[in-house]
Amino acid sequence: MKVVIIHGQSHKGSTYHIAHMLAVKISEDIKEFFLPRDFGEFCVGCTKCFTESEKKCPHFEKLKPITDAMDEANVIILASPVYVYHTTGAMKAFLDHYGYRWMVHSPEESMFKKQGVCISTAAGAGMKSTNKDMMDSLFFWGVAKRYKYGVGVAAVDWNGVSEKKKKAIEKATSSIAKRIIYNSGNIKPGIKTKGMFWICLLYTSPSPRDMRRS
């Protein structure tokens, strides 16, 4: 399997180590991107990705290596430390660029055959809301099977995480990896994803892009 990790930070702290720990348990074929190092642009709200083509986005070429890696991957891992109870600004800015891929707009067919994981860490709290920020995108992209893992590490860096906590993280990532590997031969969207897709198909107007094609 091919795995791509999108790190919501450029430093290699607890979130990085946990995401990488999970990835190597799934596959040896791993690509990693660090935000904002590998992509740090903000969506400018031009709406060209909705009304014309994603290729009209002023950041299309900068984003293309990550887009291609996600499209080629079997597993997408989105990882972000908690910043004020949410994802990092870099992760949010990154996800904003894929609004056009939400099921209500122009979903990418390959997403319905992928698995995705959201990982977040904090010294204390905020993992639930941070994971939701990322899970929303995985769901509305149509990613067939989704997993999440949030953990309070009670430390400001990986070296400060207790051995007891690291053992618990090791166990949790092994469990997720086993589920991903087990499910890899039978990737189908669940009822919730199928239901949302048909709602979007039946109750949304054709996009300007589709109207131009017809």
Set out the residue ranges of the language-model regions:
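N-terminal beta1-alpha1 ligand-phosphate binding loop
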Residues: K2-K25
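Residue-level recognition of beta-strand->loop/alpha-helix junctions
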Residues: H7, F34, Y149-G150
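A generic structural motif
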Residues: I26-K31, V143-A144
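A short beta-strand-loop structural module common to alpha/beta enzyme folds
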Residues: I30-D38
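N-terminal beta-loop-helix "entrance" segment that forms/cooperates
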Residues: R37-K55, W158-S162
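Helix-loop-strand module that forms the ligand-binding subsite of alpha/beta enzymes
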Residues: P58-Y147
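Active-site/pore-lining binding-face segments in mid-to-C-terminal subdomains
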Residues: S137-L201
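Single conserved hydrophobic/aromatic residue that forms the stacking wall/gate
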Residues: Y203-S214
